[in-house]
């Protein structure tokens, strides 16, 4: 009942508590535990308000909001198209914030005990590695601004499609 006293604005259900317990059993970091606990909060405004009220660090808030918004999509990642996967990776900022992406995958393990993040991690790593090469090539071809962004997206989609065909 301590949760009701500490967080009266949040209606925690069985799934959030189960994810928190699983996170503790897996010796996950506090940030992952926090995100797992709040993963199925109905309204992300409640998560933002809670984080503001208790002055949670920005990385806690960002991960909790990302997990809340994208966990269902990520759990069915193998069924997504290349475009949907790219949208997910961009939304999670997985190319620039690898640690947060790894925390996101750990939170998914707590939410869905049968989730194996290896495929999604390999997909993101493959895309990240190959995209870095293509960015340099695109810049050498004098792409800039919006043109560079569109060309990069096109290259990433090609890489993702190749990955999906092989896996």
Model-derived regions, located:
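Conserved, hydrophobic alpha-helical core segments of structured domains
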Residues: 1-104, 113
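Charged substrate- and nucleic-acid-binding regions of tRNA-handling and nucleotidyl-transfer enzymes
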Residues: 95-167
């Amino acid at each position: 009942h301590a949760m009701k006293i500490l967080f009266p604005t949040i209606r925690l259900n069985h799934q959030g508590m189960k994810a928190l317990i699983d996170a503790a059993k897996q010796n996950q970091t506090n940030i992952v535990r926090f995100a797992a606990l709040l993963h199925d909060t109905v309204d992300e405004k409640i998560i933002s308000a809670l984080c503001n009220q208790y002055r949670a660090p920005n990385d806690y808030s960002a991960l909790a909001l990302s997990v809340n918004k994208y966990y269902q999509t990520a759990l069915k990642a193998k069924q997504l198209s290349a475009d949907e996967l790219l949208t997910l990776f961009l939304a999670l900022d997985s190319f620039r914030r690898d640690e947060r992406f790894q925390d996101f995958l750990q939170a998914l393990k707590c939410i869905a005990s049968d989730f194996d993040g290896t495929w999604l991690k390999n997909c993101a790593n493959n895309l990240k590695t190959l995209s870095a090469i293509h960015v340099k090539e695109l810049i050498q071809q004098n792409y800039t601004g919006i043109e560079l962004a569109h060309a990069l997206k096109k290259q990433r989609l090609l890489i993702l499609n190749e990955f999906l065909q092989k896996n």
